[in-house]
Regions:
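Bimodal feature
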Residues: 1-4, 217-219
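Bacterial N-terminal signal peptides that target proteins for export
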Residues: 2-12
Length: 220
């Protein structure tokens, strides 16, 4: 009897170790220059007071599946984001080139088991569990014609474990050294909110930053 119990216990332990190993393979640090996320968002802007926010949802994280509860959309996305309020400063236009400056700040990533994102409600993108608190550097939103671009770098302030489909994840394992985000922004406005009446749709891809210091080269 004892032998059978010991054998069963050994099998349980081996299964646990196997599952732990599989989970570890699912999450690993992305090398510098590798893609750490894709996202869809909207820049919300109030032209009367020059303030704005950015919100949206993620369509890709490496090693994480089941990002949606149905067909991919804002309303089915488990992972959303929202920035703090930004001060936006338009610069004088140069021909058909328009530039808007935005200061550095903080934004958060959320995991919502029961998503209900709605472009008409900023609060719908900040519901659920906070899984990451990130910084963003000074932004320069560059527009020409019907579209524009934006690029910024950021660092990780804090990340928190979350459970999805029975597995525990942490976004800090993917990009612990920070990230650089590249966005394409539509200059054709859409509906915003009562606080930020102008919305500019956007889509982004971010890559992992490299080490802060390169090793010193050796001389022979």
């Amino acid at each position: 009897m004892t032998k059978h119990l010991n054998g069963a216990l050994r099998c349980v332990l081996e299964l646990f170790l196997l599952l732990s190993t599989i989970s570890g393979f699912a999450q690993k640090k992305v090398p510098a220059g590798g893609i750490v996320w894709n996202s869809v968002g909207q820049v919300y802007f109030n032209p009367n007071n020059g303030t704005g926010q950015v919100a949206g949802y993620f369509t890709y994280f490496p090693g994480i599946n089941d990002l949606f509860t149905g067909a991919p959309s804002a309303g089915t996305a488990h992972f959303t984001f929202r920035s703090d309020t930004l001060q936006l400063q338009p610069l004088p236009a140069q021909g058909n080139l328009n530039v808007i400056l935005a200061g550095a700040g903080v934004w958060k990533v959320y995991y919502n088991p029961t998503p209900a994102g709605d472009w008409g409600s900023l609060d719908s993108f900040s519901e659920g569990q906070v899984v990451a608190v990130l910084t963003h550097g000074t932004k320069e939103l560059i527009g020409t014609g019907a579209a524009g671009t934006n690029m910024f770098s950021g660092d990780v302030i804090a990340t928190y474990d979350f459970v999805l489909a029975g597995q525990t994840y942490n976004l800090g394992k993917i990009f612990p050294g920070g990230f650089t985000n590249f966005s394409t922004i539509s200059n054709v406005p859409s509906s915003g909110t009562s606080e930020f009446p102008v919305g500019l749709p956007s889509a982004s891809t971010a890559i992992a930053k490299g080490p802060e210091h390169r090793p010193e080269s050796s001389t022979k």
